[in-house]
Amino acid sequence: MAETSNVLRVNIVTPDGLVYDHHARMLVVHSVAGELGIMANHEPIVTPLEIGEVDVQRVDASDHNDSIAVNGGFMEVSENVASIVADSAERERDIDLSRAQAARDRAQKRIAQAKNDHNQDDLRRAQVALRRAINRINVKTSH
């Protein structure tokens, strides 16, 4: 493994517990301000996250990347630790594509129904559900 001062520890936590905990060369997240690349020795920050893919360039024998579908939350970076707290997060290898596609289809139907009913609350909830489903599909199919 690389020298610890050049390594970033990445952990992702949801209400269900720890989803991810590895050392990385680089972490890429989608914050509300745009895409952020985080490396070791980064200045301390706290930022809210968008629904999107988190890409981790791991530090190990194979130097591979891990992709995690994260549904919002926030990230804190301090002392070579990047901690992401999210409502939900799912590693690419754990995403069930057929379930994600079914969730997308349900959300699209809910959007159509909410528009027909002129129900703005249901429309917003269905749009978020659609973004989450599409995020999971994109993470699963892009690797």
From Swiss-Prot:
Cross-referenced SUPFAM superfamilies: Epsilon subunit of F1F0-ATP synthase C-terminal domain, Epsilon subunit of F1F0-ATP synthase N-terminal domain
Gene Ontology cellular component list: plasma membrane; proton-transporting ATP synthase complex
Membrane-topology descriptor: Peripheral membrane protein
Name of the featured protein: ATP synthase epsilon chain
Taxonomic source organism: Lacticaseibacillus paracasei (strain ATCC 334 / BCRC 17002 / CCUG 31169 / CIP 107868 / KCTC 3260 / NRRL B-441) (Lactobacillus paracasei)
Primary site of residence: membrane
Function: Produces ATP from ADP in the presence of a proton gradient across the membrane.
PANTHER family the record matches: ATP SYNTHASE DELTA/EPSILON CHAIN, ATP SYNTHASE EPSILON CHAIN, CHLOROPLASTIC
InterPro entries: ATP_F1_dsu/esu_C_sf, ATP_synth_F1_dsu/esu, ATP_synth_F1_dsu/esu_N, ATP_synth_F1_esu_C, ATPsynth_dsu/esu_N
